[in-house]
Amino acid sequence: MVWSFADNSDPRSWASRSRARRIRLFERLIAHLPDPVRVLDVGGGPRFWREYLRGGGRPLQITLLNLDPGQRAEGFDLVVADARDLHMFDDAAFDACFSNSLIEHVGTFYDQQRAAREMARVAPVYMVQTPHR
């Protein structure tokens, strides 16, 4: 029961429906931006975006930012860095920033604020999601 609730491969699961809602919200946020949209995904991985692109989503240029160099994947740029310090990127280097269920894992509340400020600095449009506790 719990597995089917959280199974992203089952389109009827709560997890899949929740992911689909997040994508629809993100699509509304980037609707006014020209193609291809330059997206920085802070803490994400390629699987999420492959599913989005396979579903006929808009053309995106995706940069994954992660502490784990193992997130490297064909078709995606990978930057190994900490969300609290995005000094390698200029202001508004991306059209949009996306971060799904990461910020609650970023140190103290002060650290989380630093990460949020950095995401807002590098992209004028951003979506930072965290689970309700």
Please identify what each model-predicted range represents:
Residues 1-34:
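Class I SAM-dependent methyltransferase Rossmann-like catalytic core
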Residues 30, 37-133:
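Conserved SAM-binding loop
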